[in-house]
Structure formats: C-alpha cells, structure tokens
Design a protein with these regions (language model features):
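Extracellular repetitive beta-rich solenoid segments
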Residues: 2-31
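Phosphate-end processing signature that detects enzymes handling 5′-triphosphorylated RNA
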Residues: 32-298
Length: 298
C-alpha cells in the first residue's frame, strides 16, 4: 500500500512516513511552503512628524513608549540600467548597519501584490506560497528555505524570500560598504542558483543612508521608525524624505490566544497602528517601497 501520511511540525516543515529496506519506520522531509513572517509598514508625513532640525516632534514620539535611536544603515542596490532584475521580481542589496559587525549581501525574490483587497486574507497568503512552492521556494531550498516574509503596506502586500550572506566583518559603529567593483565581484561569485538571470551590466543604485528609531506600541510590540532622505526623482538635485513606521510579528510580546492564526493577530495589530497614525493625522494613505524608490532614482 502506498504511504501518503504526511506529518507537519510547528514550524511548517513536512515529513513523510517511510519504511526502509529493513522494515524500519522512519521519516523523510518533503517540500513544503515556508511559514511566513509578517512586517506591517505605513508611511507618515515628514513635515508633520519632524521638527525643522530633523528631530522627531514630541507629540509624535508620545504615541509610543521607549522611543530611542537604534542606529544607521548604509545600503546600495544592484541592478541593470533598465532594472531587469527588479522587473523579474529580484533585488540584490548590499548594506551595513551601525549596530551589526558584518557587511551583508541579500538576494531577494519578491511576489508583489498578492492581495486583492487592502486587508490581507489567508487565501491570498496560501495562493502566493503555493506559487512560490512550484518555483522551488520551499522548506528544502538550501538558501531560501529558512523562511519568508510578507511586507504588508497600506493597500499592497508582497511575499519575499531572502538569502543573506556576510561579506566582511568591519565591526560595530560604522556603515562602510564595499565599492561598486567589490560588491559586483561578491555578487557574481555568490549568486544563488535560483537566480538564473544574467548579471552582466549590473551597477550600483545608491548609496543611501537610513536612520532607525525603535519604540513600543500599545505595550505589546516593538515598532521601527525609519527615515531616508533621497533624490526626489532621477537626475534631480531636490531631495525627499521618506519615513516609514513598521513592526514585525516576531517582535510581538503580548498574549498568544490559542487558535488565532498569525495573520489574524497581524491584522489586529495593523489596525491598532493604522488607527494610531490615521487618527492623529500623520498617515500617508499610499504605498511606497524604499527599494523601488532607490532603484528608480539612482
């Protein structure tokens, strides 16, 4: 009789019951969709939350508790002039965080606009995960199998799989990243097999710097407040400041209700943050990816 019994662990990995040649029962791992993490992101109006010197206004900071500087990040993206990688759902990022020791290279595969309405549904998530599963992004994928994340914005959600590599250890307290030549050499030598697009002609888009603050919302979850000042448009000398307020589900420290799914909890917390920002007049009612802005303007 053919064995079709599949066991699933708490982290979403799946195992099939098998019997070896000696009649001993065991398990064999089989491909399964990754269990996604969630990051909720909203944009706020810089002129309403910042003082003239660039510091955050007290009334905005008072929406949260434990508002504190977390660090700075310098980053560049690598793509062709016509952004052929991004158009195919791929991004390559080089970055260094001031509170981390190592420079990092990230290869990311994105599945954009997975939701049909502004509130993400489980059916949207499951459909996107199964599309990715058919393309080899599963729990057995050597580079990308450790997890995936859903970026959940004002009206759009994107499923992404990341493959992170350390480039060099330069210590904390700096945001030094390799130059274009060194970055391209590392990217070319370490590109995952899943990325089958040609890398000839890629160049640096950036570099830009990000300043991050952390705070606590509703006494249950850490939020990040990140600001980035970049070109307002390609070849423009004018600058634009983008400020994003976000949280990751993994930073939730409140009560876990049995039977409540990750997405149900995310939607509840998202509503709290939305009401906080919208109710105080800070929310920008639009989506916006920092990645896209840097790629298109540099």
């Amino acid at each position: 009789m053919k064995n079709n019994i599949i066991l699933e662990s708490n982290n979403g990995r799946r195992f099939k019951l098998v019997v070896d040649d000696n009649g001993i029962l065991g398990t064999k791992e089989v491909p399964a969709p990754c269990r996604p993490g969630y990051e909720v992101k909203f944009l706020v109006a810089p002129d309403l939350v910042l003082n003239s010197d660039g510091s955050y206004k007290e009334e905005f900071k008072n929406l949260f508790t434990n508002f504190a500087l977390k660090g700075t990040t310098r980053m560049s993206y690598y793509d062709t002039e016509d952004l052929s990688l991004n158009k195919a759902g791929w991004t390559i990022r080089i970055r260094k965080k001031s509170n981390k020791k190592a420079q990092q290279c990230t290869f990311k595969k994105r599945y954009p606009n997975i939701n049909k309405t502004s509130v993400l549904k489980q059916s949207n998530v499951d459909k996107a995960l199964n599309v990715a599963l058919k393309e080899g992004f599963d729990t057995l994928n050597t580079g990308f199998g450790n997890g995936c994340e859903i970026d959940y914005g004002y009206s759009k959600a994107t499923l992404s799989y990341s493959y992170d590599l350390d480039i060099a250890t330069t210590g904390k307290g700096n945001v030094d990243i390799p130059n274009q030549e060194g970055s391209i050499a590392f990217i070319t030598a370490n590109a995952p097999s899943d990325l089958t697009l040609p890398l000839e002609g890629i160049r640096e888009h950036g570099a830009v710097e990000l300043t991050s603050y952390s705070a606590i919302m509703d006494n249950v979850i850490e939020v990040a407040i990140e600001s980035m000042t970049i070109k307002a448009a390609k070849n423009s000398e004018e600058l634009e400041t983008i400020i994003e307020v976000s949280f990751k589900l993994e930073d939730y420290a409140g009560e876990i209700i049995e039977g409540k799914s990750d997405l149900q909890l995310v939607n509840e917390l998202r509503e709290v943050l939305y009401n906080l920002l919208h109710g105080n007049g800070y929310l920008l009612e639009k989506d916006g990816l920092k990645t896209t802005a840097v790629l298109e303007r540099y």
